[in-house]
C-alpha cells in the first residue's frame, strides 16, 4: 500500500481538507501543526480535536509538528515537516495548491542548483522580505512568477525544495472553492478563514465542515484571548531580544507600538514594514507570548491519533523511530509543552493538553 504524507493545519478542518484526503491514495499520514499555526496565531480549536476531525474524515495517522516547526516561514515549516514524515516512510507528499505545476521538475531544478540558488538568495538586499527574496530566486532559476496571495502555491514550492534530495514523490491537488484568505463561499467549499469568521453560524459550519459537531462544541481560542498575556510579556521582559528571532530593531518597534495598540491586529500593523511582513511579525509575537528560545527539534515523534491501518503502520516502525504516545511516561518537547500551557490560558474550558493524554483512536 502506498504511504502518503500530508502536511496540514486543519484550522479548522473543512470540506476542502476532506476533498484532499479523498484524492490522496493509500495510507494517509498527517503531519499537523499543534496549538499554534504557521502564520503565528493560536489554532481556533485544540490539536486533539483537530486530530479527531482528520481521523473521522479519513486520515490514518496524525502526528504533531513541534512548535519550532509549526510556527515558521514556509521553507523552514516545509523542511521540518518533510523530515519528520520521511522518518515515517512516506512515499509521496500530497498537497493542495492554487496552481498545479510540474513540481517534480521544479524540485529537480533545486536539487541540481541548490548551492547556487541559496547563494543567490543570500545575496539579495535585506530591504526585501524573505517571501520577496524567495520569489526572485524561483523566477531567476525556474522562470516562475507568482503572487504572494497564493500561500498554498508558495508552500508547494517550499515542499519542492524540501524533497529535492529525498525519494519522495510530489502529488499536487488543485485547490477547490474559495481562496485561502477568502471570506466568501461557494456551494460546497469555504476557506478556513471564512469558517473562523462564522463560528457563531451553525448552518454555515454544518454546510462547509464535515465534522461540524466537533467544531461547534470544542472550546475556541483566538489572539484576542491571549493578547493580555502577550502585553504582560512585552511590558515585563527586560530584553525582548532574548526571544527566538527577535532583533534589537524589532524589540524597539514592538515596545513603542504596544503603547498605542489595543489589539493584536493594531500591534502587527504598526510593527510590520516592507521588510518585515505581517506574518513574520505575528510569528515573532507568538515566540514572545510563549517565551520561545532557540531549541533543537525533538527526536521523538508525538502521535495524536490513528486508525486501525495507522496502528499497523506504527507497529512496523517500532524500533526504527522514536514514537511518543503518552507525554509524561516519556518526555517530548519542552517548548511545545510550554506553548500548550500558554494556549490553555486562552480558554478555561480547555482540557490538559499533554500530561495523561493518549492518542485519539478510531478503529
From Swiss-Prot:
Q: Name one GO biological process term.
A: tRNA modification
Instruction: Spell out the subcellular localization from the entry.
Output: Cytoplasm
Cellular component per GO, a single term = cytoplasm
HAMAP family attached here? TmcAL
Kindly list the GO molecular function terms attached to this UniProt entry.
ATP binding; ligase activity, forming carbon-nitrogen bonds; tRNA binding
One short Pfam name that applies is HIGH_NTase1
EC number of the protein: 6.3.4.-
Positions binding ATP in this chain are 7-20, 96, 152, 175
Q: What does this protein do?
A: Catalyzes the formation of N(4)-acetylcytidine (ac(4)C) at the wobble position of elongator tRNA(Met), using acetate and ATP as substrates. First activates an acetate ion to form acetyladenylate (Ac-AMP) and then transfers the acetyl group to tRNA to form ac(4)C34.
Q: What is this protein called?
A: tRNA(Met) cytidine acetate ligase
Q: Do you know which NCBIfam families this protein is assigned to? A: PRK13670.1
The family line of this record is: Belongs to the TmcAL family.
Keyword line: ATP-binding, Cytoplasm, Ligase, Nucleotide-binding, RNA-binding, tRNA processing, tRNA-binding
Q: Does the keyword Nucleotide-binding apply?
A: yes
Which reaction(s) does its UniProt entry say it catalyses? Answer: cytidine(34) in elongator tRNA(Met) + acetate + ATP = N(4)-acetylcytidine(34) in elongator tRNA(Met) + AMP + diphosphate
Amino acid at each position: 500500500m502506498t504511504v502518503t504524507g500530508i502536511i496540514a493545519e486543519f484550522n479548522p478542518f473543512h470540506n476542502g481538507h476532506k476533498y484532499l484526503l479523498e484524492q490522496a491514495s493509500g495510507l494517509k499520514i498527517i503531519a499537523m501543526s499543534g496549538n499554534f499555526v504557521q502564520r503565528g496565531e493560536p489554532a481556533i480549536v485544540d490539536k486533539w480535536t483537530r486530530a479527531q476531525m482528520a481521523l473521522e474524515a479519513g486520515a490514518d495517522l496524525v502526528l504533531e509538528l513541534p512548535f519550532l516547526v509549526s510556527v515558521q516561514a514556509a521553507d523552514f515549516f516545509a523542511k521540518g515537516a518533510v523530515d519528520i514524515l520521511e522518518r515515517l516512510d512516506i512515499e509521496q507528499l500530497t498537497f493542495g495548491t492554487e496552481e498545479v505545476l510540474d513540481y517534480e521538475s521544479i524540485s529537480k531544478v533545486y536539487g541540481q542548483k541548490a548551492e547556487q540558488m541559496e547563494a543567490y538568495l543570500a545575496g539579495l538586499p535585506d530591504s526585501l522580505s524573505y517571501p520577496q527574496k524567495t520569489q526572485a530566486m524561483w523566477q531567476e532559476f525556474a522562470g516562475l512568477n507568482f503572487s504572494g496571495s497564493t500561500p498554498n502555491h508558495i508552500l508547494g514550492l517550499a515542499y519542492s525544495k524540501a524533497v529535492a534530495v529525498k525519494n519522495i514523490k510530489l502529488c499536487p491537488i488543485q485547490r477547490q472553492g474559495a481562496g485561502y484568505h477568502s471570506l466568501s463561499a461557494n456551494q460546497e467549499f469555504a476557506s478556513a478563514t471564512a469558517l473562523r469568521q462564522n463560528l457563531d453560524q451553525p448552518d454555515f459550519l454544518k454546510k462547509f465542515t464535515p465534522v461540524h459537531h466537533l467544531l461547534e462544541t470544542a472550546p475556541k481560542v483566538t489572539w484576542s484571548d491571549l493578547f493580555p498575556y502577550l502585553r504582560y510579556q512585552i511590558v515585563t521582559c527586560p530584553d525582548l531580544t532574548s526571544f527566538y528571532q527577535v532583533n534589537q530593531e524589532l524589540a524597539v518597534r514592538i515596545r513603542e507600538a504596544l503603547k498605542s495598540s489595543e489589539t493584536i491586529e493594531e500591534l502587527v500593523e504598526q510593527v510590520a514594514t516592507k521588510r518585515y511582513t505581517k506574518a513574520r511579525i505575528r510569528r515573532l509575537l507568538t515566540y514572545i507570548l510563549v517565551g520561545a528560545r532557540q531549541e533543537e527539534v525533538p527526536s521523538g515523534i508525538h502521535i495524536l491519533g490513528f486508525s486501525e491501518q495507522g496502528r499497523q503502520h506504527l507497529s512496523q516502525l517500532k524500533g526504527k523511530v522514536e514514537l511518543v504516545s503518552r507525554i509524561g511516561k516519556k518526555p517530548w518537547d519542552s517548548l511545545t509543552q510550554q506553548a500548550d500551557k500558554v494556549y490553555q490560558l486562552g480558554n478555561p474550558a480547555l482540557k490538559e493538553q499533554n500530561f495523561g493524554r493518549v492518542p485519539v483512536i478510531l478503529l
